[in-house]
Amino acid sequence: MRLQLCIFLSFLLKSLSAHNDFYTSIGHMTDLLFTEKDMVTSLKEYIRVEESKLEQVKRWADQLESLSITAIQDPEGFLGHPVNAFKLMKRLNTEWGMLETLVLSDTTEAFISNLTMQRKHFPTEDDQTGAAKALLRLQDTYHLETNTIATGNLPGVTYKSPMTVEDCYELGKIAYSDSDYYHTELWMSQSLQQLDQGEESTIDKVTVLDYLSYAIYQQGELERALEITKRLLSLDSEHQRARGNLKYFEFQMLQQRSDEEEAAQKQRNEGTVGNKTEEKKKGFKEPIPERKMYEKLCRGEGIQMTPRRQSRLFCRYYDNHRNPMYLLSPVKQEDEWDRPYIVRYHDIISHSEIEKVKSLAKPRLRRATVHDPLTGKLTTALYRVSKSAWLTGYDDPLIDKINQRIEDLTGLEMDTAEEMQVANYGVGGQYEPHFDFGRKDEPDAFKELGTGNRVATWLFYMTDVAAGGATVFPDVGAAVWPKKGTAVFWYNLFASGEGDYSTRHAACPVLVGNKWGKSRDIYYYRGYVPEKYPFTLTETTCYCIYFEVSLISNLK
């Protein structure tokens, strides 16, 4: 502030010095009075602007302080709400940058220096965009109303977090940038609704209506686009783009009516009756059947288990054929599905073990990769949104302890195991339908690891998830829901060594909560195979058993 005042006074003195000998002329002196009056007005405006800046900063600081007190009490529970996660990305990437610009000219050099330095470690534009798209993905997968998300009323939430007009507008704008006019319409409409309800915002109705009219037009609804454009012009009659759009939409409407009349006349002349159905364009391609089934199963719909098949599923105490480790204290085993055969082990991992694995993995997390069948290399993919870390028994004896537990329960040896992969799924994180084994068209899928194919999959669940997070099998209509302290297990290969395509599965996005997982590729040469899987391995048979441990927990 002092620097700005010095610059202002310097400019003023230079201006005054251009007119010297004022005392020799009352006329000149009277001019000075008016000059001084203008100076005072300018000075007061400067003070008003600075006070306004400080008031904005103070108000923003108070809001953040209140938010931080709530968030720090349970950081992971707080960020388990996807809106909170999105707003955190938005605050750190956009709003803190706006604050930096606001106070940059002030004398708070220490704050600016610290903020500038810290911003190097802040989320990027890509992070903000990614969080926004995650919200849109959750909205589609779980059929959530826009207002439900905007008001924070998600199922099972502890911390409700309403979205502002700016938040909704930002989602709509990101969708618009992707030519996703369906979601653009949804979120611009929500922004407009909140503005109509009297919410104060830096975003005006004209800007929102401009996006909204174009999004509706792109979906083929000329009449609605025309109505929105007329409303925009009622607020700003000089809006050039809207005036041009109005003429264009009216022309298109006339052309459309003319085409419809010609088509109707042609049908009458040909003596046929046409039945026309209008279908709203959503701005994206119709999902493939697997995608539909995947999303239905994630919502708990479309599960294809009949009562007769259900009656053949049982629970039992299991010791893996009198394994010494479980002879006196067998584990609880439950049949989850028959084809493919999936079993669940109850009370198989403790809370302290979960926390230990998380603490080991957190500093090592990097963006997860998948095998590209075209290049044969590992690469990132949009269908797998997570970060991964790698752990071994050298990092902590617990890793070996968990591996030994799996070996004792499955009878499969893991002496030549690769490192264990730990994955963390972020907001809306998912792993879309995939196979855990290599197909015939991927003979070199695991060549770089020096392994055979993946025989089986093991999953640990670490919390009871309030909403989302299921493991689903679209081809057979199966869904397995997370339950704290349990693990599920299935084989990916038939006895012949051929892949079981019914094991194609997916990790549904977690709607509320955080999801952690760890996987491990292991050579397998010999060992006992359960009776329900009559698959004999010889000393020379080389397969890879794939253990994936899904840790669903709140990161602290």
Residue ranges, per PLM feature:
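Fe(II)/2-oxoglutarate oxygenase catalytic core
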Residues: 2-487, 493-556
